Amino acid sequence: MLLLEAATRTGWIDRNQMVAPSEILAHVAAIIPSTHFVTDLTRTSVTILAAFALGVLGGVPLGVLLWRVRVIGRVLEPFIVTGYAMPTLLFYPILVAVLGLNAGPIVVIASTMALIPIALTTMVALGDVKPVLHKLARSVDASRRQQYFKVLFPAATPLIFPGIKLGFIYAVIGTIAMEFILASKGLGFRAGFMYRELYVADMWAYIAIVVVFSIAVNSALGLAERAIRRDML
């Protein structure tokens, strides 16, 4: 940070591209009390969390299905991987026609981006559970629910949760990118507006806010992972 501060202050880095970290912090402090910041933060937070929740609620069961029914897994996995590489922005006009010009299309696109890595890692994680654990569950006459929640998911959690964290990252990327290009409110929209209007310091301030938000939620997911593993064992 000190090197970046010195480089921007001395002109080694073009101030039209990057400003000093101290200046970014000053702009963050000025932005946070503003009324439009609360609106933008609320819109982006709700969109990200909705997309992430849909990604988890859809991705984990899909991953279980792909693992449990091997035929479906073999058939669908190539299409899911292909969809992972497909630019989902192409579907935005269709989603606007169906859902309207609101946050709905952004939530759908961001949740799809989050769902795919969660589903794939869930499938792989359950497939890596040691066979002896399956035998153990059957030997104690565990119900199907007990097998999943007392044996399989605790054993697979170390691999599932990295996929969930990756899904959150993709939910953030999808939301911010879509807001940057297409939305009329949100942190991504505001950063894009500042970029187009050449307010470089404000643009970096909004980027810094998004980074801090992402780190905070990712840290919360790490705490949740440890709590869930402790409760499920």
Language model features with spans:
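Periplasmic/extracellular loop-to-transmembrane helix junction in inner-membrane transport proteins
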Residues: 10-53
